[in-house]
Amino acid sequence: VSSAASDVYKRQLKWLHQTTSDVLVITGSGTAAMEAGIINTLSRGDKVLCGDNGKFGERWVKVARAYGLDVEVIKAEWGQPLDPEAFRSALEADSAKAIKAVILTHSETSTGVINDLESIARHVKAHGTALTLADCVTSLGATNVPMDAWGLDVVASGAQKGYMLPPGLSFVAMSARAWEAYERSDLPKFY
């Protein structure tokens, strides 16, 4: 890829994510992008909240546990959105600031439900230290996902959904806070 073409796609990816942060390109699936976000910002034993209201929320719980994270699941029935108040309660109860991240799916592919990512991210921001890691594979490009305005730290997406491109590429946008967490992260990294 020429430097001119590279400049164009980097600029357009930032525009799509509504961010001034870095957007990285990975040759892999949306799952690879989300796993990359998890392993590059967290460390073994870190406490995380995972939203689970469908197949992909379920997947992030499994991935987080596979990497030795301490996972608290906030669950909703399939076909129902995650309750932002459940996240608020869990985050407010965390006076020791042990929760390092909230991991959730914006648009749950398996059911079509869109979770209130904006409200949940607002509660994470009020916590003060936790990161918001969002699976936006089916939402980015199809609905509004203003990364900077919502205070999202990691946004994972894939070419084959909202981008309407052939599969095989995925994208990980990382905030400055996510890059700081990367410096401390000790999980094994393949991406």
Stretch-by-stretch model annotation:
Residues 1-5, 9:
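Single conserved hydrophobic/aromatic residue that forms the stacking wall/gate
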Residues 21-49, 53, 57-62:
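Conserved beta-loop-alpha segment that forms the PLP phosphate-binding cup at the N-terminus of a helix
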Residues 24-27, 50, 73-74, 103-104, ...:
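General beta-strand structural signal in soluble alpha/beta enzymes
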Residues 69-77:
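Short beta-strand elements in bilobed, periplasmic/extracellular small-molecule ligand-binding domains
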Residues 82-139, 162:
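Active-site phosphate-binding strand-loop segment of PLP-dependent enzymes
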Residues 148-160:
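Conserved active-site segment immediately N-terminal to the catalytic lysine
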Residues 160-191:
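Active-site C-terminal subdomain of aminotransferase-like
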